[in-house]
Amino acid sequence: MPVSRLKLTFWSVVILCSGLAVAGRPDGGYHLLKKYDLDAAPGGKEYWDYITFDASSRRLYISHNTEVKVVNADTGAVVGSVPDLKRVHGIVVMDDLGRGFISDGGADEVVVFDLKTLKPTGHIKTGGNPDCIIYDPASKHIFTMNGKSNDASVIDPAALTVLATIPIGGRPEYAVPDGHGTIYDNVEDKNEVVAIDSMRNTVKSHWPIAPAEEATAIDLDAQHHRLFIGGRNKLLAIMNVDSGKVVQTFPIGAGVDTNIFEASTGMLFVATREGTLHVYHEISPDNFSVVEAVKTEFGARNMALDPKSHQLFLDTADFAPAAEPSTEQPHPQPTPVSGTFRLLVYGR
């Protein structure tokens, strides 16, 4: 449903821990709470991808071109970084092992680092361009979805070895485990979701996601067996994983990259590059309602959730206008401005 714009009864702006604290909205909707500057990327080229929130340390691990920035989630302070990478995508944090795992797509490897010192301690070769990286609690293995070689690498996080390579049959994107031995993965160029048996390391099902296309973002309501699939054709599809059927769809903004379902509240969040945060609520497994569409900032397509505070973390930067079209670049895009990378905190 459309959301009316209500005038704020007051604005107060204060500098707090180097972040911008913003007055709350009287209508109780999601709004910007704080904004933190995160410094320029090494080498000056701004690029970012996944954000990982670690509840035990209350740290954010933020991919930032050739480094992972580590940020205090409560203060916005940068506490360190994992440097000297090629092109970072995702981060898995395993507190029980004291290790973190980074998918470095530019090096075709996973970089292992110490959670205390943030120093790299190992390198594991994977398939080409490992993008999404997840931990599967059923198998206790790490999986990387490799966008160039169209397969998944299965890693033992204790032994730091590759156990298997799973052919996907297309370009794998974001994936999510159900905790019981199945991983659901978007296959972007095939317009389908595959179900991976994480105990046998095989693909067991292929499901079309129509009318959604070019899916990137994905998350799961594990209790009710519903997948939330974000398509780059500006469509959110909700799928029953027992049948592989799409049961509901919603229009969304351009450039979706993250879906998050919060099981404790039944809230579903969808972040898009155009600068819209879509918020939905689960009435029943086959009936989601639109709560609101929140204007964020252009480029804020990646997101993490703090389940304690229910706050959302997004990141973006300023953008320079796109260049004029040319033969080499017929569809130029706006480019991020070096030194403007920042963290946005949203909540109610």
Describe each model-derived feature in a short phrase:
Residues 1-11:
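Bacterial N-terminal signal peptides that target proteins for export
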Residues 9-19:
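Bacterial N-terminal signal peptides
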Residues 19-348:
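Predominantly soluble domains enriched in secretory-pathway, periplasmic, or organellar proteins
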